[in-house]
Amino acid sequence: MKKTVFTGAATAIVTPLTESGVDYAQFARLIEWQIAEGIDAIVVCGTTGEASTLTDDEHKEAIRFCVEQVAGRVPVIAGTGSNDTAYAIELTKYAGEVGADAVLLVTPYYNKATQRGLIESFRATADASSVPCILYNVPSRTGCNLTPATVAVLAEHPNIVAIKEASGNISQIAELAHLVGDKIDIYSGNDDQIVPILSLGGKGVISVLSNIMPKATSEMCHKFFEGDTEGARRLQLDLLPLVNALFCEVNPIPAKAAVSAMGFCENYVRLPLTTMEDANREKLLTLMREQKLI
């Protein structure tokens, strides 16, 4: 088995933005709070971090800043995937140079590559990387599913160490665990499937929920690992209404609204994303009040 990047919960952290750019003062506050609350790792410039609307310079600077702010206290995983393999390689090399502990490589989107194309793209990026690579399968966003058979081929690469599985397809994830569970780590990419994926041998979750509940999300994982499966199950189900509210509009619109309500950023997202509808936001805030988050 390859070295595990992290065990437990990693926050797919929002990027605090204003009309003028990234708000690094608020970003620092959010990172510090995450670490104080016991998060196990931080993923910067992922889907939730609005990487797709950051400029190239902002993307690189956000990675560098996060690594510097965290200062080795927890692993930092940089989102460096792209539908342009050459650019993914450029970002991946940069992340390694500035000290990221690993990179997260989303399946190339829009191009609708064949499985052979996915294999060649991920291999090329992993070959160029100085740090471990985590694959990221999210077909609802990319229009392209990374099949278990393809992951089994990629799992033979020494630098590909894990996969974030956000397909939502438990049958596919079970097949994945059967094929590669002894070769690479599997992380849930969906907050409503943390415990089910842990039960298949998963090592944790790359989470949206942990933007606002890092301690509880980490505890859910560690309760399971420590044998308190009933406690983990209860947390999973108790937090389900809040999880659903965080996905009632496309991520990261609700996550940004929630983090904003806690005072860590402005409720600002870049077009084509728009801020949360008032009725949905009020439902989210009501659930947050019930959890004493605001």
What are these regions (language model features)?
Residues 5-15, 33, 37-39, 199-202, ...:
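C-terminal alpha-helical cap/extension of soluble enzyme domains
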Residues 127, 141-247:
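Catalytic alpha/beta core domains of metabolic enzymes, predominantly
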